[in-house]
């Protein structure tokens, strides 16, 4: 990991632990962790030459198969590191996609994952091939160069085919969203970091039995269920989990999930209470940032602090003081998907729907403007 903020003595440890957890989930055995502090990443290797040399020795000594970087690697950095270290080099984006692949069950998820892979690796493949066949021009289109262009064109065609397929799915999803709007059925989307308990709460509220696992990203494609809250028909949607410091390109590759969040009447942001306070705060702030980047307004967000069953009365009271400050400006409540304790959440949803459906009175400035225009017209 490259740490670019020399004054960060805590946050990078959280990020590194998160990376280790993801690596273990993907089936890797983590044998060591290395951090370098530099204010600016190096163009070719991300890290400095001395650290590359140290890492190379470690790879050889420990017989390492993969080196996983927390930082996003450019195609150039990935290629040069792979050549220098003589092993597979991946970043957190690729690691996340590996976990997605292990969890993918439906065709839509697999299609989105493949598209994300192609977007990431096509530039790398082009750079790798350009270096490999550099200088190999004994005559026009040597065999190596010909093979390169043939493979590159095949990859481009595949990427285009998948992109067009996803665009069709996007239009179909937009049509479904529009149909729900016409029916007047509000949509409630559950969002949050992976393992926050979204699917467990979805099952509890909707009476479903969708797969739940401690492994990250059990849910990749959105799940829908028509339910009722105080005789009000409501669509509940369970979506893919977030990760801390989520790569924007990864978000862009999962447009179908973004559409569900962006079009929701209410987004229930689940935050798990089984983490230390600093991680609870980090995950909450990161989740809010992701939702804002997607286009979800704060007024449509309700915070559900899940796994409240882990708290006794004294702990809950003490934690409430911390959360009241942290969640200032948001409506929030404690929930427990495990114990099916979510009545407070349903009350907040009902209240929020009433607020959102309430006609808005025009601003005072607009009224004054209209009055002046009317007055001028009558006098003329």
State the predicted function of each range.
Residues 6-10, 209-211, 240-251, 272-281:
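Flexible beta-alpha connector loops of hexameric P-loop NTPases
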Residues 119-196, 202-203, 292-380:
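C-terminal-of-GTPase-core extension/linker across diverse P-loop GTPases
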Residues 95-113:
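Short alpha-helix plus adjacent loop in nuclease-associated cores
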Residues 183-186, 205-235, 243-256:
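Switch I (effector-binding) loop of TRAFAC-class P-loop GTPase G-domains
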Residues 15-24, 56-59, 73-83, 87, ...:
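Conserved C-terminal guanine-recognition region of P-loop GTPase G domains, centered on the G4
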Residues 2-5, 36-39, 98, 239, ...:
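G-domain G4 guanine-recognition motif of GTPases
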Residues 19, 67, 118, 201, ...:
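Residue-level signature of catalytic and energy-coupling elements of molecular machines
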Residues 1-98:
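N-terminal accessory targeting/assembly segments
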């Amino acid at each position: 990991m490259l740490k670019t903020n020399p004054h960060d003595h805590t946050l990078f440890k959280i990020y590194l632990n998160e990376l280790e957890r993801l690596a273990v989930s993907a089936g890797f055995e983590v044998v060591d962790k290395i951090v370098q502090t530099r204010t600016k990443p190096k163009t070719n290797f991300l890290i400095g030459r001395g650290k590359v040399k140290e890492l190379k020795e470690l790879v050889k000594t420990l017989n390492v198969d993969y080196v996983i970087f927390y930082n996003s690697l450019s195609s150039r950095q990935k290629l040069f590191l792979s050549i220098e270290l003589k092993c597979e080099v991946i970043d957190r984006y690729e690691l996340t996609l590996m976990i997605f692949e292990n969890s993918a069950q439906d065709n839509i998820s697999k299609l989105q994952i493949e598209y994300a892979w192609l977007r990431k690796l096509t530039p790398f493949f082009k750079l790798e091939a350009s270096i490999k066949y550099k200088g190999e021009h004994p005559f026009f289109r040597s065999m190596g160069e010909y093979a390169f262009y043939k493979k590159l064109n095949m990859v481009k065609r595949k990427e285009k085919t998948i992109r067009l397929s996803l665009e069709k799915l996007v239009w179909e999803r937009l049509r479904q969203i529009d149909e729900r709007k016409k029916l007047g059925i509000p949509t409630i989307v559950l969002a949050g970091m992976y393992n926050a308990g979204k699917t467990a709460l979805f099952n509890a509220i909707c009476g479903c039995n969708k797969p739940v696992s401690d492994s990250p990203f059990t849910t990749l494609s959105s799940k829908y269920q028509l339910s009722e809250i105080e005789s009000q028909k409501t669509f509940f949607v369970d979506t893919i989990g977030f990760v801390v410091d989520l790569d924007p390109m990864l978000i862009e590759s999962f447009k179908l999930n973004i559409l569900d969040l962006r079009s929701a009447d209410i987004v229930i942001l689940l935050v798990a209470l089984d983490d230390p306070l600093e991680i609870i705060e980090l995950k909450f702030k990161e989740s809010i940032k992701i939702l804002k980047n997607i286009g979800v307004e704060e007024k449509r967000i309700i915070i559900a602090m899940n796994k409240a069953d882990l708290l006794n009365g004294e702990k809950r009271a003490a934690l409430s003081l911390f959360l009241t400050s942290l969640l200032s400006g948001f409506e929030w409540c404690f929930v427990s998907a495990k114990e099916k304790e979510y009545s407070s959440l349903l009350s907040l949803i009902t209240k929020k729907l009433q607020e959102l459906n309430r006609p808005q009175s025009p601003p005072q400035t607009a009224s004054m403007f209209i009055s002046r225009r009317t007055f001028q017209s009558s006098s003329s």
